[in-house]
């Protein structure tokens, strides 16, 4: 049950398709529907003390410098949120691609660790496999029983 790796040229094409599909869909949806309206900066009264700020926040006192700074930060927050909502399909595709890449990387690393563990067990069991032939000297352990050639056990000495 071995996973078949994707051919090298197919992986970048797959990633490109994942990135391009939501972006193309979003651009088609934007071209069909009306363009996103810009934040209503022209219809709002300028920040500062005046009746516009008092009715907007629902407070009876005239707005001072504190309320004007909260207006500008609120406008900036609305602008940032609207930009994020406009680019939501692209952000979603980017997160999906990053998640897929991370998952693939973790799976490859786990597979590599698992396979190297099998190799280490074989190396410990049959140490002669990984040792160069020039460094191995084999001598029979049971020299007194020379009639049984099949059951001779060898001692490995490293030089």
Curated annotation (Swiss-Prot):
Looking at the UniProt entry, the stretches that span the membrane are: 91-111
**Protein name in UniProt:** Membrane protein FAM174B
Underlying gene: FAM174B
**Membrane-topology annotation of the record:** Single-pass type I membrane protein
* Organism, as annotated: Homo sapiens (Human)
Q: Which GO terms describe its biological process?
A: Golgi organization
Organism lineage reads as: Eukaryota, Metazoa, Chordata, Craniata, Vertebrata
Family in the record: Belongs to the FAM174 family.
Q: What does this protein do?
A: Essential for Golgi structural integrity.
Q: Where is this region: Disordered?
A: 30-74
């Amino acid at each position: 049950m071995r996973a078949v790796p994707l051919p090298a040229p197919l992986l970048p094409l797959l990633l490109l398709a994942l990135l391009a599909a939501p972006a193309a869909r979003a651009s088609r949806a934007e071209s069909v529907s009306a363009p996103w309206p810009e934040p209503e900066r022209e219809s709002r009264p300028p920040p500062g003390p005046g009746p516009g700020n008092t009715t907007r926040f629902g407070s009876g006192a005239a707005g001072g410098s504190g309320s004007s700074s909260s207006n500008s930060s609120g406008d900036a927050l609305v602008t940032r949120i609207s930009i994020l909502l406009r680019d939501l399909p692209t952000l979603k595709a980017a997160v999906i691609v990053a998640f897929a890449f991370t998952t693939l990387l973790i799976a490859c690393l786990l597979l590599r660790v698992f396979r190297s563990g099998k190799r280490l067990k074989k190396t410990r069991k049959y140490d002669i496999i990984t040792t160069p032939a020039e460094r191995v000297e084999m001598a029979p352990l049971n020299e007194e029983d020379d009639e049984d050639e099949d059951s001779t056990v060898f001692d490995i000495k490293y030089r």
